[in-house]
């Protein structure tokens, strides 16, 4: 798994946009910015839809007030799913929705989880990374089935 002090890896994934999606390299996207990136197993899944994404949408103004330039959401879904999910939660254009369809970024970060037993394939683990100018400043990954350290509220506490 990526460690504190390491640079975000350079890979090409998709960012959900109002038009659909565009290619993006998170390493370039995060350069020069203070970023909170929360990661999750899947759009439209219960915890992700009821708690994770809505929490970050709600706390976005407070996160910005603490100096965060960008809040990004990473999931192993295609950009069309991420776009529809973001629209449903009024997040499109507010939260940067990163669609890691082939789990390339999740694997490069070392946060991939094999959920094939649950018929979900390879996914991203639930967690949150604080990144400054492309360098990981902190990483908190959840234990399987938990939602304790990666919530927007926990993120706010960590930022002080």
Positions of predicted regions on the chain:
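Chalcogenol-based redox active-site neighborhoods
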Residues: 1-160
């Amino acid at each position: 798994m990526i460690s504190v002090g390491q640079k975000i890896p350079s890979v090409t994934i998709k960012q959900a946009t109002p038009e659909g999606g565009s290619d993006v390299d998170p390493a370039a996207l995060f350069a020069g910015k203070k970023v909170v990136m929360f990661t999750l197993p899947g759009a439209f899944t219960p915890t992700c839809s009821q708690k994770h994404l809505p929490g970050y949408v709600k706390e976005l103004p407070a996160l910005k007030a603490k100096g965060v330039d960008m809040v990004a959401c990473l999931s192993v879904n295609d950009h069309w799913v991420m776009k529809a999910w973001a629209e449903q939660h009024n997040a499109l254009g507010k939260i940067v929705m990163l669609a890691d369809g082939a789990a390339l970024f999740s694997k490069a970060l070392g946060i991939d989880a094999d959920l094939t037993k649950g018929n979900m394939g390879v996914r991203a683990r639930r967690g949150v990374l604080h990144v400054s100018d492309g360098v990981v400043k902190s990483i908190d990954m959840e234990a399987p089935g938990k939602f304790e350290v990666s919530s927007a509220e926990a993120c706010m506490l960590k930022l002080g």
